Curated annotation (Swiss-Prot):
It holds the Pfam family Homeodomain. Gene3D superfamilies: Homeodomain-like (1.10.10.60). GO terms for cellular component: cytoplasm; nucleus. Atypical homeodomain protein which does not bind DNA and is required to modulate cardiac growth and development. Acts via its interaction with SRF, thereby modulating the expression of SRF-dependent cardiac-specific genes and cardiac development. Prevents SRF-dependent transcription either by inhibiting SRF binding to DNA or by recruiting histone deacetylase (HDAC) proteins that prevent transcription by SRF. Overexpression causes cardiac hypertrophy. Acts as a co-chaperone for HSPA1A and HSPA1B chaperone proteins and assists in chaperone-mediated protein refolding. This is Homeodomain-only protein. It comes from the Eukaryota. It is found in: Nucleus; Cytoplasm. Interacts with serum response factor (SRF). Component of a large complex containing histone deacetylases such as HDAC2. Interacts with the acetylated forms of HSPA1A and HSPA1B. Interacts with HSPA8.
Length: 73
């Protein structure tokens, strides 16, 4: 029986995503994102959405704006 709900990834999937976010890369390129998605058993779209939301959460925790603009803006 799966613990996955329509609201998001399972605990095991989050563990994989968090490991990659914290230890590998906060901004994975498309190839890396595809590999992370395959490892977690999620779609690339779900994985990309998770990374975008997690990055915004991390930026807020660091006292940075959730969306980063270019230094030339």
């Amino acid at each position: 029986m799966s613990t996955e709900t329509a609201s998001g990834p399972t605990e095991d999937q989050v563990e994989i995503l968090e490991y990659n976010f914290n230890k590998v890369n906060k901004h994975p390129d498309p190839t890396t994102l595809c590999l992370i998605a395959a490892e977690a058993g999620l779609s690339e779209e779900e994985t990309q959405k998770w990374f975008k939301q997690r990055l915004a959460q991390w930026r807020r925790s660091e006292g940075l704006p959730s969306e980063c603009r270019s230094v030339t803006d």
